[in-house]
Amino acid sequence: MINIRIKKLTQKGINVASIKRAHHDFDIDTPNTDSYLHRKAGSKQVIVSSSKRWAKITELDNKKEKRIEKLLKKLDNTDIVIVEGFKKELHKKIEIINQSNENYLFNEIENVIAVVSNSKLNANLPQFKKNEIDLIVNFILKY
């Protein structure tokens, strides 16, 4: 769902970056490549670079996750950042509700600016259906 919005924004000429919070350990490297082996040997940071893209992989010693403000500073040349996760952070949020339950984020925090759900909710916020992609993208751009 977020991928569709990113695609629509980029089609409008917007330079989009995204940040995704992982709730589990993850690895974007491929086993047995040089960069993977550098990390396994003890390198705390590895940069992999080609003519098409580059990536920086940083190993965290303290197991403490980076705050969104620190991660945002790592981005450059972007018009908008789409963030998935980081519910407790202070940035503005559009809550996407996939199933019916009563523990809505918009009831718990003040920085939800809109809701996306196929159900009508008792929320004093702009509400969109999941298939209203253009309306959601335009809302984001105007906000």
Predicted regions located by residue number:
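Phosphate/Mg2+-binding loops and adjacent switch elements
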Residues: 80-142
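Phosphate-binding/switch loop-helix module in NTP-utilizing enzymes
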Residues: 59-88
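Short loop/turn elements that form and flank the Walker-type P-loop nucleotide-binding site
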Residues: 42, 76-77, 109
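Anionic group-transfer/hydrolysis microenvironments
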Residues: 22, 51-52, 61, 86, ...
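Structural motif corresponding to alpha-helix initiation and N-cap regions
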Residues: 31-32, 65-68, 130
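Short secondary-structure boundary/capping segments
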Residues: 37-38, 72, 104-107
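N-terminal phosphate/diphosphate-binding loop that engages ATP/GTP or pyrophosphate donors
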Residues: 3-60
